[in-house]
């Protein structure tokens, strides 16, 4: 059994849970502890089953509650050295993870985390550091790519390998261009170290997906500069225009910003 659920995806808070029958891991903990407890109770999960926390980067919407979970449940926190330092310097993280539960990861170096084999890889973003994760369980490859400034060659290879993929589709280019954000913020989002547009996400998928890919989740949609239906239609149009080979056919969903999605079985 290998399952996945999104508990929040967007600037209001990001948190994802991957689990097997023996326990699971959280990817980012950017939602409040009361919200996390409520969601776990709703789905019949136990916070005592969380064996690891993987952190992508040190922005508040990804790490706000990482120290609370680590302290209260004795959960080790995996992140790069720069991200660990960023967490300790982030005033939004009021409770810091215990030093004895810090685990340092190095991009490109695989490690075991409970039942899972995990490989972090670099993703360009304007944080202290940022990584995606390739997570393998029983031969199934799950990849997480969030807060993506642009798609690198290394990321393209992981897209090609993935059976299941979470990838950012943050903004619609026209909505951002015509929206109320100041010029400096618009440039920060779109300059290659900010976030990934719907069009860039769709292009990466139709260009690099293989027959291995079974399902995609579009994550971290902007509330101001995107809409779930726009993200969906952009990918659907790209798939039609590319005329994908018949052996490549994957499902996809758009993850909700503030409420959990359904539990997906990864088979």
Q: How does the language model describe each region?
A:
Residues 153-252:
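Cap/insert and terminal regions of metallo-dependent hydrolase folds
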Residues 33-80:
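Active-site metal-binding motif and surrounding structural segment of the metallo-beta-lactamase
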Residues 81-132, 137-139:
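Metallo-beta-lactamase
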Residues 64-73, 89-91, 226-233:
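Metal-dependent catalytic neighborhoods of phosphoester/phosphodiester hydrolases
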Residues 5-16, 58-66, 120:
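Structured catalytic core of nucleotide-sugar glycosyltransferases
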Residues 12, 59-63, 85-86, 128, ...:
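Active-site environment of divalent metal-dependent phosphoester hydrolases
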Residues 27-30, 51-58, 78-81, 143-146, ...:
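Active-site neighborhood of phospho(di)ester-bond hydrolases with catalytic His/Asp-centered motifs
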Residues 1-43, 131-147, 164:
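Conserved beta-strand hairpin/beta-sheet module of binuclear metal-dependent hydrolase folds
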